[in-house]
Amino acid sequence: MAVDSPDERLQRRIAQLFAEDEQVKAARPLEAVSAAVSAPGMRLAQIAATVMAGYADRPAAGQRAFELNTDDATGRTSLRLLPRFETITYRELWQRVGEVAAAWHHDPENPLRAGDFVALLGFTSIDYATLDLADIHLGAVTVPLQASAAVSQLIAILTETSPRLLASTPEHLDAAVECLLAGTTPERLVVFDYHPEDDDQRAAFESARRRLADAGSLVIVETLDAVRARGRDLPAAPLFVPDTDDDPLALLIYTSGSTGTPKGAMYTNRLAATMWQGNSMLQGNSQRVGINLNYMPMSHIAGRISLFGVLARGGTAYFAAKSDMSTLFEDIGLVRPTEIFFVPRVCDMVFQRYQSELDRRSVAGADLDTLDREVKADLRQNYLGGRFLVAVVGSAPLAAEMKTFMESVLDLPLHDGYGSTEAGASVLLDNQIQRPPVLDYKLVDVPELGYFRTDRPHPRGELLLKAETTIPGYYKRPEVTAEIFDEDGFYKTGDIVAELEHDRLVYVDRRNNVLKLSQGEFVTVAHLEAVFASSPLIRQIFIYGSSERSYLLAVIVPTDDALRGRDTATLKSALAESIQRIAKDANLQPYEIPRDFLIETEPFTIANGLLSGIAKLLRPNLKERYGAQLEQMYTDLATGQADELLALRREAADLPVLETVSRAAKAMLGVASADMRPDAHFTDLGGDSLSALSFSNLLHEIFGVEVPVGVVVSPANELRDLANYIEAERNSGAKRPTFTSVHGGGSEIRAADLTLDKFIDARTLAAADSIPHAPVPAQTVLLTGANGYLGRFLCLEWLERLDKTGGTLICVVRGSDAAAARKRLDSAFDSGDPGLLEHYQQLAARTLEVLAGDIGDPNLGLDDATWQRLAETVDLIVHPAALVNHVLPYTQLFGPNVVGTAEIVRLAITARRKPVTYLSTVGVADQVDPAEYQEDSDVREMSAVRVVRESYANGYGNSKWAGEVLLREAHDLCGLPVAVFRSDMILAHSRYAGQLNVQDVFTRLILSLVATGIAPYSFYRTDADGNRQRAHYDGLPADFTAAAITALGIQATEGFRTYDVLNPYDDGISLDEFVDWLVESGHPIQRITDYSDWFHRFETAIRALPEKQRQASVLPLLDAYRNPCPAVRGAILPAKEFQAAVQTAKIGPEQDIPHLSAPLIDKYVSDLELLQLL
């Protein structure tokens, strides 16, 4: 039986769609319109007008329908998406464009003229398209801003471009207002995609107006609907058509590039027109039906071509409902696009859905080939809409096996596109040079990496090219422009390619020696090779990886001693053990450790072409010799992992739990069998918080039991403990609260979800109001998190207080038993200050009891008898313990930080009512309108609804908010006394040596400044004359923070108090002053005037530091300093309640919140020297 080829199946699909699908038939491009658009001499606005007139009655653009939804609990109204799209015609779209153009053009005070700049901040939508097209109509220069960019970056761009007008969605109004208040030039702020019926959107709009008005700003704030209404009654604005010989600027696309400094790629009128006229696979040839879903930002060239390429063909451009891709596949299923541009991340999401469906449907005896076909057919028809005719992938390399998988799902070729903002979106397609737009290309030698045009069998080198779509340069950056072109005018791509034949190129590598792995982590392979070469068993090592992979491999030449007396298996085990030991000693990250390796007994030499004349590894030659074997190893590892995980899912019911847990960890982390001991820790095997998240999800799939990340990474838990935890959960019969059981699904969480009856039994809740209050003053205090950075100083404060009265401090610390827990706590005070350690030990001997427990466990991990003893004897609870992780999502922090706090509440309302001191975070304010924020207001009202997303610290902030909500509920239930402390940066202890938080960003910065000896002229944006501005750094010493929390917590024997633990002064004490103090103390630090120059020199210097210093440096957080900060005077949040309480209680030497001082900064240096980091 003959099997259809993919092309035959595609042709049959096309014929069927044109015969049966009315939407597809109606979207066929018109030859007359296509010819007019492509006619020589057509200018950008003429093309747009021609398209809009030629397809006037067709549907042009579609967005998700919505309805208004009022929350019964809060009374707030929001938009709820409906499972359908609504469209407008080309005529209606162009009418909207005309209204906006007329309003702007005829504005009596600030008319917009050709050449003026308009900046847009938001996600792609019909309103966004309207504004963009209005710019085209008038000849204005569009500046699409990256919605994810830091405010400092946005300000830099707006300062450089001086736009007359800034348009923003409600979601980004805070950033827009920050830019305007920073003194940028827009005269108007237009708010688009605005629905005043939505309470949050209306609040954002009103807040923006109020903030600008309060600041005395003259910026006019109005909605796009108001602009359109004004323009509706005005004469039409003239269509901008430049003179024949004129090619004015039409668009700036800003890209950070490799330097991190925003650079505006200039698109002239002619270049911008090619986005409509192009005939590339991405844009679509003039006869291809275009129905697509636009999910890429308009600040990216692919996003713009995706939109305009479809409109130019008379198709329908639908817009994704949300920018975070949370509705992407729901949107795709509703739209059923005929074409799509994939990015690798979306391919990963499809594959994850495939794996999940495959596992869900797998049953014993199922035919895997049949199941594979069924799942892929279901994905193709339902998940992806079932009528794709063209699919393209781009923006980053896609692994070959992923490409094969996607093609098998789509039943279509997945075309591989290569381009860039500077060169144009369509330079290569399926490795073939695209002519047009490419006019010429060449390869140039890269001798430092060993790539030459004389290489055989194929020439290799950096790709340089000339193309019709290449930008003329960067806006106002002549020096940077000069760097990206050679003397013959060829654009330097920075990419190494191999020329298989004329016009057929294959991507090889980036010229930069720093390798970016697929998860976004950068590794310096030469550095890693040097680290591992220190092993007595390793003679030479070649590290191998690519941007398509998340982990590294290696080729190892063993030493003669290593080879002597060992067979292959024993040798490999010895080498693997050596690598792990060296990695641990060097504090390498898991992604920096090769997961597997080839053993080569022939050394790399000059003679065999693997070393250069100065004995450097010749990477191209090494890749040529070992590349195929290493790629096969990647394939084998992936296959082995998938097979093992599938086997585990099937066999888990018949295997001991410990065996399943160990095999799952082995498969997920790719470690050797010899390392899989029952007493091994997940983190010691190379796991980190992200891999722990995947492991947690896997264990839940296998066992049907929630295994939080905190349990996986707990230093008290070995693999056998994880197995015991799972067995206990399976046998308990009781289900602990989870994110889903409390909040349901979705991306919003509500304070109303967090009711105590979801966490605490009815009997305890019913009795809470009738139990006696704990005695005052407290004599028995329970402290969680005592071995944490702040926790240790709270421990010391309470030991000192209770020692005077004969009281007892009980600390719950993670550990396999009480002795191990006590050892962990003791080590927190052993920082190199003998006086501190002796003081602690003397107090502890008289006053301290340590229990082994875990806040994430039922009963805090304590047995019933101990729990009951605490319930009956504890007088006050201090709860700073939390899983502090700014990467993990709320779902994973829910167990330790929310359920754990609920257990604290349960203890507090059992047997006697015990006041609670709770440590929260200023991150709670992250999702609160600054105008609505009050220090002591009820968080349930101030932040009733919050968004769950994957942004930095979102999960942690939400988890601490949830803890506050639960405590508010407990207070309402029975008058439980509560004191909440929202802390910001907690700095070093003022007195005790070595006591500073090595992991926090401030310590890392001080270390990096002193170690590199360079600092910027100012960390903040300078004034118009280039002078330093008055600024403030918000932080408090750990000892004052602990003293304040303890003193105020003792007083909280009734009521509910909330304090923002901040340094609120407009005192001019900032990062700049810290550098001044360091210089005055004799540390040789050079100030660099140009901030960008400093940043790049700083990064280079940090990367060159010794390994121990580099690991403790600011390198992982360096992006925070990529651009100068706004000069903020005073604290970001109010702290009046806290300051008044501190003054009344006379806390600290000054009986007030202290100012930061030079001695504290000097102590940072001495502490880092004591810890041998400086």
Curated annotation (Swiss-Prot):
Is competitively inhibited by anthranilate when using benzoate as substrate. Residues 655-730 form the Carrier domain. 4'-phosphopantetheine is transferred from CoA to Ser-689 by Npt. Its cofactor is pantetheine 4'-phosphate. Its EC number is 1.2.1.-, 1.2.1.30. The keyword ATP-binding applies. One of its GO terms (cellular component) is membrane. The modification O-(pantetheine 4'-phosphoryl)serine is found at residue 689. GO terms for biological process: biosynthetic process. It catalyses: a carboxylate + ATP + NADPH + H(+) = an aldehyde + AMP + diphosphate + NADP(+); an aromatic aldehyde + AMP + diphosphate + NADP(+) = an aromatic carboxylate + ATP + NADPH + H(+). Catalyzes the ATP- and NADPH-dependent reduction of carboxylic acids to the corresponding aldehydes. Catalyzes the reduction of a very wide range of aliphatic carboxylic acids as well as many aryl carboxylic acids. Aryl carboxylic acid substrates include substituted benzoic acids, phenyl-substituted aliphatic acids, heterocyclic carboxylic acids, and polyaromatic ring carboxylic acids. Cannot reduce benzaldehyde to benzyl alcohol. The N-terminal domain likely catalyzes substrate activation by formation of an initial acyl-AMP intermediate, the central region contains the phosphopantetheine attachment site, and the C-terminal domain catalyzes the reduction by NADPH of the intermediate thioester formed from the attack of the phosphopantetheine thiol at the carbonyl carbon of acyl-AMP. Large-scale domain motions occur between the adenylation and thiolation states. Phosphopantetheine binding alters the orientation of a key Asp, resulting in a productive orientation of the bound nicotinamide. Belongs to the ATP-dependent AMP-binding enzyme family. Carboxylic acid reductase subfamily. This is Carboxylic acid reductase. The gene is car.
